[in-house]
Amino acid sequence: MIVYLEIHDEGTNDMKYQTAWCTDVGIRKDTNQDSALLMQAESVQGSVLFAVICDGMGGLAKGEVASASLIQRFRNWFVREFPLLLQESAFSAALSQSWNRLIQEQNRAIADYGQQFHVNLGTTVAALLLVGDNYYIINVGDSRVYLLSSQIYQLTHDQTVVQKEIDEGRLTPEQAASDPRSSVLLQCVGASQVVAPEFLAGEVEHSTRFLLCCDGFRHEISPQEMYETLSRSTAVTKQDMEQGLQYLVELNKNRNEVDNITALMIDVE
């Protein structure tokens, strides 16, 4: 388990960020294989916020190594490579290429580590970058990014067997929730021969929130329960946000969630 927090919850542009996070090993596992990153910096475009969550594969040995190594690589990227990208006229395309290159490199590096030490390991990743009035997301696996405004929206698309079955009309979301294949990933950094990240971009509106979470955070609770606990009308202050996240962690555990549980939340004023 590795968590980097390098934030100051304020910005010099017309947007101000508040952040909260939580992580819990859960009720069954001895090791927390999740890792997370929250970083903030000032740029020519104002305050920039970067959030990443990685879920080391639960049934695979050394999943915490995979998630921590990818988080470390994203941290280095934000410090060393991101400032140069801001000079690109086609920023979105350059960012997508940079992130994709990073994912492919880490996919090979984690796979090589596994071969060297004769272990299976891998990790999901969901990353969110807020720059100016825009957001950018990259996703591999089944960690998620949600947007909370007038209601809750799932921005990322799970790269799982059951989601593919839903997309192709062979399962309903209700059937998928109890399907024994619900944890089977189609994409995983370090355990997939070919990784095809999902890249998203959109405009950031004021008075909204972003929630990044691993699958352990949302297995046993509904999106509506997330919204009712974490919306701006309910969780007003930073302390409220932190308490809301912790409440949902305990709710998951009380409902016998067995996985590690991690979530990050960003409020945009």
Where do the protein language model's features map onto the residues?
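PP2C/PPM-type serine/threonine phosphatase catalytic domain
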Residues: 2-269
